[in-house]
């Protein structure tokens, strides 16, 4: 893909990550290597027809690192050109701690790799019928969920964007909402307390260990006024960390509100 800014690159990668996650092909964790992205970058003067000399940037372990590397390399190349120096076609390694890069090796052109056709591989012919069969079997994708959450559950667009922005959130939301029948309240608990605790514990959404059943029970307890909001949040921390049954816990600890 041909892109012109760090923002455009990150938007593309985030979209690609969601597609792959929803297909179940990978969890797409850059820091663990289940998703990789190298960046080839060049600059040219405004109005110039030809691209400048490109470099390839490696060791990019997060979307934030990719954005910083793009901005850093763009600035480095512009500085070289303005000083009358040449940009060397090379592979560079990004150091996110120092927010700078250093040369690894010279970057060859395609002909230098000496590519040639593999004689033992037969041509693969993909029919329109095969494509349609694959389409029919693929799971519901993020964009489809985004619309459905607003239409079926009556969620605001903001809620739907957050919940579908990670498949783990979407799966948790749908399962819990199906149990308690309170989609907006389930959404609120995921978007506030769940995300807060994930950040505090430096966890990713796919590391959530509590069950949808226990989240649904807590939503019911809070909605019925059986526990105060303060108690509900305290109990949820136990649910988040230990996946306890909130209903049994509040009864055992005498935390039910007396009307």
Describe the predicted segments one by one.
Residues 1-259:
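Charged, compositionally biased, marginally structured helical/coil segments
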